[in-house]
Amino acid sequence: SSVMIDGSHLPYEENVALTKQVVEYAHQFGVTVEGELGVLAGVEDEVVAEHSNYTQPEEVIDFVTRTGCDSLAISIGTSHGANKFTPEQCTRDENGILIPPPLRFDILKEIEEKLPGFPIVLHGSSSVPQEYVKIINENGGKLKDAVGIPEEQLRKAAASAVCKINIDSDGRLAMTAAVRQFFNTDPDKFDPRQYLGPAREELKKLYTHKVVNVLGSAGKA
């Protein structure tokens, strides 16, 4: 019922043209389209961006009007993957734990004012739970300086015009932690039904927490 077209890595006019083309085709079949404006750092679907480029609020009205997209993914400081920020971009608490920079809620507010009521999307918003990082690293993994978006910032975003928040990396971390822990405890096992069961349960636990306690989307399906 919906698709996402990410032309954010293209020059602005090319992004507009590509998104408009997808919208015109998809709308023939009643399919809604999510466009994207602003670049997130990281790797997604083999598209690599070394640095984030924040969404420019002055472009959003023109982009939405010309493309006809139904929702808009923006860049306000999130990024793809489990290593969302370099140590140099972060501060550290008294225990040496990395504290990521805050999201640019000022940009979000300005976009909301220019597009009142329009559905906004955040990609690259996994929190990278440190308990999963710890389990992975204690069981053969090598996730160095992995840090994500604090949940309190996601709660704030979810209370705004943001209607969709992508947290794929958190799910990957949950399953990987469960699988690594399983094999470290039972290295002689090889039946997928045995190690995927705990992985699914951990994934279920994670998303239940996110839906109920962070994203505020419980009961809204």
Which sequence ranges carry the predicted segments?
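Short catalytic/ligand-gating loop segments at beta-alpha or beta-beta junctions
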Residues: 122-127
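C-terminal alpha-helical cap/extension of soluble enzyme domains
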Residues: 138, 149-221
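Alpha/beta enzyme core
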Residues: 1-119, 130-135, 139-147, 151, ...
